[in-house]
Amino acid sequence: MSTLVFAKFTINDHAGYSRYVKLATPIFLREKVIVHASDEEPQALSPYMQADKVVLLEFRDHSHFKNFFSQTDYIEAAKIRDAASTISATVFERFEMPK
């Protein structure tokens, strides 16, 4: 079953965050991560959901998720992301309606 990650960001350094995107995008492509959403103008439905950016990612399964975040090149890119932004993320399993 697919594993999803929802992340919201407060971006403190836009140039730094752009460097992260430039480094991370080829890794997402190489590892076949599906990016369902990447919105830099999200509309919060409640005050605690305010964010400069939101992202929704899909991984084949939990193993794919764990493997992706353990890639050395992604770990290095994530250091740049973390220096440029504050992230809050949640991992969860895809829900499938019973038939």
Feature-to-residue mapping (PLM):
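C-terminal structural segments of small proteins and small subunits
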Residues: 65-68, 72-90
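Short S/T/G/P-rich N-terminal loop/turn motif that feeds into the first structured element of a domain
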Residues: 1-54, 59-70, 93-99
